[in-house]
Swiss-Prot record:
Its main location: membrane. This is Biopolymer transport protein ExbD. The gene is exbD. The chain crosses the membrane at residues 18-38. GO terms for biological process: protein transport. Involved in the TonB-dependent energy-dependent transport of various receptor-bound substrates. Keywords: Cell membrane, Membrane, Protein transport, Transmembrane, Transmembrane helix, Transport. It comes from the Bacteria. Residues 1-17 are cytoplasmic. InterPro entries: ExbD (IPR003400).
Amino acid sequence: MIIVRSMEEKEISSMNVIPLVDIMLVLLTIVLTTATFIAKGEIPVELPEAKSGKAVQPQESVVITITKEGKIYLKSREVSYEELKEFLKTLNRQTPVEINADKNAKLENFVKVFDLLNQYGFKNVNLLVKKE
């Protein structure tokens, strides 16, 4: 008696994981790439709109952000009002300063920061807005 086995009946002794590893590496690459863009992130601020205004020439400037919650950020790092004061004391008065205030931020917070800049003699101060 002759027993013939077809190829379909062959027992699988182990699973081939190479395709799984390939897919995982592709997914890891995608996640790391998108995480880089997210990590650069910005502080979520909704800029007010204005009909007038002009584009500012890109140069090394200090960006002060005021959120609608009243938090102050200096170069994407949250700081207290006192820390901002200390930083501005050491800064060259000719350095351009950009105020990036949320349109729903309290006017009081904006005025405090703007007054501080005037108090220390900063003349090159810009308010960032979104063009209508």
